[in-house]
Each structure stands twice: as C-alpha cells, then as structure tokens.
Curated annotation (Swiss-Prot):
Its main location: secreted. It is found in: Secreted. The gene is APOA2. It comes from Panthera tigris altaica (Siberian tiger). Monomer. Interacts with NAXE and NDRG1. This is Apolipoprotein A-II.
C-alpha cells in the first residue's frame, strides 16, 4: 500500500514538474516574440530615418511644399479679400439705418 501511495505521489510530482517546465517554456517563447517585435520596429525606424536623411527625399519634400505654397497663396489671398468685403458689407448695412 505504501509502495502504491509512493508511486502515485511520484507520478503526480513528475507530471506537475512537466507542466511547470512547459509553462516556463511558453513564457519564454512569448518574451522572445515580444523582443523580436520590438527589434523589428526598432530596425524599421532606423531604416526610415536613414532614408529620410537622403537628399533625394528632402528635395522631393521641398518641391512638394513649394508647389503647395504656389497653389494655396492665391486662394488664401482671395479668401482674405472676400472676407474683408463681406465684413464691409455688414458694416455698410448697419451704418445706413443709423443715418436715416
């Protein structure tokens, strides 16, 4: 009877140890996965910074901003003029009833 109890106890301990080892292995694989993810993101960021330092990309960005400024400047000036005219019309409408 004691031998049977010792055998059951030994098998239980071995199975629990095996489960503990598997659980630790799963945690390590999760840590490894997260570590690889952060390493990939870091490498991608470094590559992006190196590409942004290139003169070709800077020249493209400068040309884009200049083109945008050329297209938007007349629109902004026209919008400003229209706004001033609109406000002047309100001022004239308020001034007319007061003089009558």
């Amino acid at each position: 009877m004691k031998l049977l109890a010792m055998t059951v106890l030994l098998l239980t301990i071995c199975s629990l140890e095996g489960a503990l080892v598997r659980r630790q292995a799963e945690e390590l694989s999760l840590q490894r996965l997260v570590s690889q993810y952060f390493q990939t993101v870091t490498d991608y960021g470094k590559d992006l910074v190196e590409k942004a330092k290139g003169p070709e990309l800077q020249a493209q960005a400068k040309a884009y901003f200049e083109k945008t400024q050329e297209q938007l400047t007349p629109l902004v000036k026209k919008a400003g003029t229209d706004l001033i005219n609109f406000l002047n019309n309100f001022m004239d409408l308020k001034a007319q009833p007061a003089t009558q």
